[in-house]
Amino acid sequence: WKALTDQVLLERYGMTEIGMGLSNPYVGERRAGHVGQALPGVDAQLFDEAQKPILEENVPGEIRIKGDNVFLEYWNNETATKESFVDGWFCTGDVAVLDKGYFRIMGRSSVDIIKSGGYKLSALEIEGTLLTHDDIAEVAVIGVEDETWGESVSAFVVLKPNKTLAYVDLKGWCDGKMSGYKIPKALHVVDALPRNAMGKVTKPALKALAS
C-alpha cells in the first residue's frame, strides 16, 4: 500500500459517539491487528462485567471512553443516553484486551464474544483463522446455546467454487492452528451469509438458523 499510494495505513478505533478514540501512532510502533492507544485528551479503560476496571493485560473487557471527544446525548432519547454512561464513562459495547499497552479488539459484546466453557472467545479471531483455509471464501462464527459449554462455537461458511468441506476435515485442519476450546463444534455450509443493507453479516439470523 505504501509503495502504491505513498500513504501509511493506520489501524484505529472510533465510532459516531466518540469520533476517533484510539490509534496506532503516526510515528513509532504500529502493530498489525491492534488499534493502538488512547489519543491525546482521551481516557480509555477496560471494565469487567462487575463494573470494575481491568488492570491486567490480556483480560477481555468492555472499552469505555472519557474525554471532550465524547458526545453529550442521543437526540430526544434520554433513556438511551442514560444507559450508555456509567460514572461518566461512555460504554462502547466493544470488547478488547490490552496487549503490551496496545488495545486489540475482540468484537461486539452482543454478537462477537462467545462465552464457552469459562472462556471468553473472540468470534473475529476464529473467523480470521478459518479464512486462511484454502476452501473457505466467507465465514461467520457464532455462539449457540449449549447445556454443557454455555455456548458452543458454530461456524457458517461459504465455500469457494467446486469445493466441499466436512466437519471432521475442518476439525483436523484447526488442530494446531487454534486452541482446542476455540475449534468450532459445528459446521454449516451455506450458499451465502445473511447481510444487512450495510453489507454486514447479521449474526442473529445465523443464530436462528443454528437453533
Residue ranges and their predicted role:
Residues 39-42, 136, 184:
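Core-facing hydrophobic residues within beta-strands of well-ordered domains
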Residues 10-16, 36-38, 142-145, 188:
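Beta-strand->loop->alpha-helix junctions that form or flank phosphate-binding loops
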Residues 37-41, 52-84, 102, 121:
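Conserved ATP/PPi-binding loop(s) of AMP-dependent carboxylate-activating enzymes
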